[in-house]
Amino acid sequence: MQTGRGFDSHQLHNQMNSPIAKWWKPIKGVNQMSLSKVLCTLCPRYCKIGDGQRGFCFIRKNIDGTLYQEGYGKVIGLAVDPIEKKPLNHFLPSSTILSFGTAGCNLGCKFCQNWHMSKVKDDNKISQYVTPEQIVKVANDNGCKSIAYTYNEPIIFGEFIIEVSKLARQSGLKNVMVTNGYITKEAREEVFQYIDAANVDLKAFTETFYHNLTYSHLEDVLDTIKWLYNETDVWIELTNLIIPTHNDNRYEIIDMINWILENCSDKLPLHFTAFHPDFKMKDLPRTSRDTLNGARKVARNMGMKYVYTGNVSDSKSQTTYCPQCKSSMISRIWHSVIPFWKLTCDCGYKLEGVFK
């Protein structure tokens, strides 16, 4: 197909910084219309995308039977954060991290806390094009120890992650993904190949919740968590956003903890965080501190060693305690680490995590 001034449409998209996507294949059809459809294989949604259309995530588009990654380098929200904000409590504590995202998401969470980015339909209005080299330079210039792919769902801009994370590692920086974990087996090894740590958002522990409130499936997320913890060197922590009346049932929390203990470890850090009314779920109250601490108590009583609360100010529940003697090792207030923290307790216990 030709466009104005004799440009081929594929060449035009490449000039506009939209590279051909990595994970897709053409759909073999029985008529001319189906010949131009493509199957995206990046996430378990497996979108079948017609010519000129986008996938569910918004930033992957079919042009003349070729799938393009239209979010490549279109950065939103470039900012320096404390790493505890991700949240990661056992990965380079007290360091700063350069964070960014793009438009779009491969889930449809009705409670999305970043909907102004994940649900945007014209990313050109709020994004700026930034090269991988520029991102790494900004991180180094600001004294950051790592780069976070976050805010929306980074899986959907996996091609860009690979380029940035490779350069970051070469320059001595660590790489962090804050992710919903909704990715296929075909894509995950490439996307995570240079990732050092991940916080996976385990949104609930029922298929009903995932189906009705996120338009996705729980089992695919659990498979990613198991793979990350058992088959990679990625440091992993989990976050569970507790939403009143939807996933705050004590028995659901017990089921989730049992699964973590059976499939991962009692030393996997777990963050229970507070929901605030947003997007399509503004009719619900904020999560109470008592609810968060109740979930934390259940998890600790079941044997989890590192359980935290978030989105509330509670130094006690945000402090890291020695699993052996219960003394404080890393004290925090909100996202700040109080000085004089230690990685080896006075009793001799060495804290699990990545610290250099």
Tell what function each PLM region has.
Residues C109-Q113:
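The canonical Cys-X-X-Cys-His
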Residues E84-L88, L107, S127-A139:
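Short, charged beta->alpha transition segments
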Residues F56-T66, G71-L78, D122-I135, S336-D346:
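Short cysteine/histidine-rich metal-coordination sites, predominantly Zn2+-binding motifs
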Residues P132-T287:
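Conserved AdoMet/S-adenosylmethionine-binding subsite of the radical SAM
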Residues M16-D51, T245-K356:
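Auxiliary Fe-S-binding modules of radical SAM enzymes
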Residues Q2, H10-Q15:
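Low-complexity, intrinsically disordered or signal/transmembrane-proximal segments
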Residues M16-C40, P44-T102, W115-K119, Q318, ...:
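N-terminal [4Fe-4S]-dependent radical SAM core
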